[in-house]
Structure formats: structure tokens, C-alpha cells
């Protein structure tokens, strides 16, 4: 097949297929021959070739996402934001609890408690 001097613009001799393919060229004929499956021979040699083909497989490597690092930063930023909100709420509750405790100690009169400051 490699020794054939074929021009890729030559028309092939297709009988009855000209309407379907719109005319065939030598290039299409060669590609058609390459695409045909070879007949399998039964025997031990065929089994060995299958085993070799199975051994040649490679593991699939995880392809890094284009935006993976950006998504990671968004997750970290979101976690920090939520943590900030939680810390602010805890501080607010501490101030409210401290106010309740001091108001109960002073009998609800903050002027008496604040008198040393004024």
C-alpha cells in the first residue's frame, strides 16, 4: 500500500456509491481501508496481545481546574467572614450579660455605679 503512487485528487472507482458520497477520491479509499477492522485470529498469540494491551493502560491523572485556587480562596474568605460574624455576636452577648449583671448589683441605678467616674 505504501508503494502505490497515488494522487489524492484522483477519482476512485466506486460503483453505485457516487450518489451517496458525491464521488470518492483515492484519499478516501485509503482512509476507508485503514478504518476497516482486521479479522481476529484465534489462538494463544491473540491472548498475549490482549494482555499486553491491558498492561499498557495508564492511570487517569486529575486535571487541575482553571479556577481551583480562586475557589479555594473564596471558601477561605467565606469562612473568615462567618467566623467574624460569630465572634461579633459573642462579644455582643458578653456585653449584654455584663450589663445585666452590673444592673442587678446596682439595683438598676447606673448613676450610683458610675458615680466614681464623674
From Swiss-Prot:
Membrane topology annotation: Single-pass membrane protein
Compositional bias per record (Basic residues), positions renumbered to this chain: 39-63
Cellular compartments per GO CC: membrane
Region (Disordered): 1-63
Keyword Transmembrane helix: yes
Cellular localization per UniProt: Membrane
Biased composition (Polar residues): 1-12
Transmembrane segments: 81-101
Chief site of localization: membrane
InterPro entries to which the protein is assigned, alphabetical: C27D6.3-like (IPR040019)
Alphabetic keyword roster: Membrane, Transmembrane, Transmembrane helix
Tagged with keyword Magnesium: no
Protein name per Swiss-Prot or TrEMBL: Uncharacterized protein C27D6.3
Organism of derivation: Caenorhabditis elegans
Lineage, top ranks: Eukaryota, Metazoa, Ecdysozoa, Nematoda, Chromadorea
Amino acid at each position: 500500500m505504501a508503494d502505490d503512487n497515488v494522487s489524492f485528487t484522483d477519482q476512485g472507482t466506486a460503483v453505485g456509491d457516487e450518489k451517496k458520497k458525491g464521488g470518492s477520491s483515492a484519499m478516501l479509499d485509503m482512509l476507508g481501508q485503514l478504518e476497516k477492522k482486521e479479522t481476529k485470529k484465534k489462538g494463544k498469540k491473540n491472548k498475549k496481545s490482549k494482555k499486553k494491551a491491558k498492561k499498557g493502560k495508564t492511570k487517569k491523572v486529575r486535571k487541575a481546574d482553571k479556577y481551583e485556587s480562586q475557589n479555594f480562596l473564596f471558601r477561605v474568605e467565606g469562612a473568615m467572614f462567618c467566623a467574624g460574624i460569630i465572634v461579633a455576636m459573642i462579644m455582643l452577648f458578653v456585653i449584654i450579660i455584663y450589663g445585666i449583671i452590673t444592673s442587678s448589683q446596682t439595683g438598676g441605678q447606673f448613676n450610683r455605679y458610675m458615680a466614681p467616674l464623674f
